[in-house]
């Protein structure tokens, strides 16, 4: 997982494509789309090869009840827009091309936004925080020459 926090933008119900459930999440580096392949409207199972992300990217994690498309944001034709100084918007499409010729191909537009600020790099303290007194156990700690010798490597022992 990237250092950036994953931000869930939306849980979408794709009514045009057999009521597939689609979830999208993203970070500064990655975009992840999860699809539950059971169409509720007709009790139809959608196969992994009937779906692709953006410019032909297949599901790269296939489980019985979820397909995951996990790609770098620079892959698959994923587009990046700068919304503000702190926010990026990623845009792509998920395509459904059914094996059954009685169903029309479908396209869903997906968007996900994330913050440019990493939670790992955000300061958690301020200059107004409470300062603790130094520990009395370390304050008068003195090492002897013998202790220092034990901590260093001796050329005679090598």
Curated annotation (Swiss-Prot):
Highly expressed in oocytes. Keywords: Cytoplasm, Secreted, Signal. It comes from the Eukaryota. The keyword Secreted applies. The keyword Ion transport does not apply. It is found in: Secreted; Cytoplasm. It comes from Homo sapiens. This is Oocyte-secreted protein 2. One of its GO terms (biological process) is oocyte maturation. Residues 1-17 form the signal peptide. Belongs to the PLAC1 family. One of its GO terms (cellular component) is cytoplasm. Gene3D superfamilies: Zona pellucida, ZP-N domain. Involved in oocyte maturation. InterPro entries: PLAC1_fam.
